């Protein structure tokens, strides 16, 4: 499932915390991650991701999903990009 497919199935106002995981096929030990929050964003909702994020991010494969509670709920999404 891609990030776009997942986010399209969410409520538009759900908070999404997206983490990019970079992996190397040639070196299975290589593993790096960082939060994906484009410059200037203070909040990342499903609606915002669909409307403003570039296709190269939306097409990334979802690795894991973590749903957290709270008043509105938050979706933690790990996506993977292979670097080689």
Which residues does each predicted region cover?
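Short acidic DE-rich linear segments
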Residues: 82-84
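Acidic, low-complexity, intrinsically disordered interaction modules
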Residues: 20-79
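Short, structural beta-strand-to-alpha-helix junction motif
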Residues: 1-4
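Short loop-to-beta-strand transition segments
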Residues: 15-19
């Amino acid at each position: 499932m891609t990030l776009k497919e997942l986010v399209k199935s969410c409520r538009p106002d759900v908070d999404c915390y997206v983490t990019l995981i970079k992996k190397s096929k040639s070196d299975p030990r290589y593993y790096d991650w960082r939060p994906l929050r484009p410059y200037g964003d203070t909040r990342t909702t499903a609606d915002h991701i669909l409307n403003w994020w570039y296709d190269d991010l939306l097409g990334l494969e979802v690795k894991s999903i973590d749903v957290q509670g709270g008043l509105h709920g938050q979706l933690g999404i790990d996506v993977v990009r292979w670097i080689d």
